[in-house]
Each structure stands twice: as C-alpha cells, then as structure tokens.
C-alpha cells in the first residue's frame, strides 16, 4: 500500500504546507471584493476572510424597506461568494504546490 512512499519526506512536506497556508492566508486577508445590486444602488465590500468591510446604500432606497432588504441580500451573497471562490482557488494552488508527497517515481 505504501510502496514507493518515502516517509522521511513527510515532515518536509508538512512544513512546506504549513508555510504555504500561512502565506496564502495573509494574501487572502489583503484582498478586497466588491459587489453591487440594483444597478449600483447598494454596494458591499468584503475581505478575503469573508468579513464585510463596507456597505453603501443610495438614499433613494431608505424609504423602501423591502427593496433595500432584497438588494442588500443580493449584494452580500455575491460578495461572500467571491471571497469563498477565492479561498477555493487559493486552496487549489496550495495543494498543487505540495509536490509528490515523497513518492518515488
């Protein structure tokens, strides 16, 4: 089952993975994503961790609670999906950079 696997490299691979994860997490924190809804009446910004940084609402929506709620939900969902998609892309890059896990070819 473990034929061709070099266990002596496992520590090295894990250390590399840890370093890559820390670097990619720092990279993610510095990213900002933005989404708009209602033709720009509502805009939302979030960072790579999915934390909402800013919400801007056009004054014309302040008296239309139902529309405001719908547009806020839409913009927030969009920006959080962007952050999540970026996390998945970063994870894919990290896993791709781990090499052959010590398998001898």
Curated annotation (Swiss-Prot):
InterPro entries: YbaB-like_sf (IPR036894), YbaB/EbfC (IPR004401)
Extent of the signal sequence: none
Lineage: superkingdom: Bacteria
Location in the cell: Cytoplasm, Nucleoid
Family designation: Belongs to the YbaB/EbfC family.
NCBIfam families assigned to the protein according to its UniProt record, in alphabetical order: DNA_YbaB_EbfC (TIGR00103)
The protein's name in its UniProt record: Nucleoid-associated protein Ccur92_18190
Naturally occurring in which organism (per UniProt): Campylobacter curvus (strain 525.92)
């Amino acid at each position: 089952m473990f034929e061709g696997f070099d266990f002596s490299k496992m520590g090295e691979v894990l250390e590399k993975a840890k370093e890559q994860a820390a670097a990619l997490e720092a990279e993610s924190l510095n990213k900002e994503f933005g989404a708009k809804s209602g033709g720009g009446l509502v805009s939302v910004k979030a960072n790579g961790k999915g934390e909402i940084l800013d919400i801007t609402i056009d004054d014309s929506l302040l008296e239309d609670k139902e529309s405001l709620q719908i547009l806020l939900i839409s913009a927030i969902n969009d920006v959080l999906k962007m952050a999540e998609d970026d996390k998945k892309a970063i994870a894919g890059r990290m896993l791709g950079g781990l090499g052959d896990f010590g398998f001898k070819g």
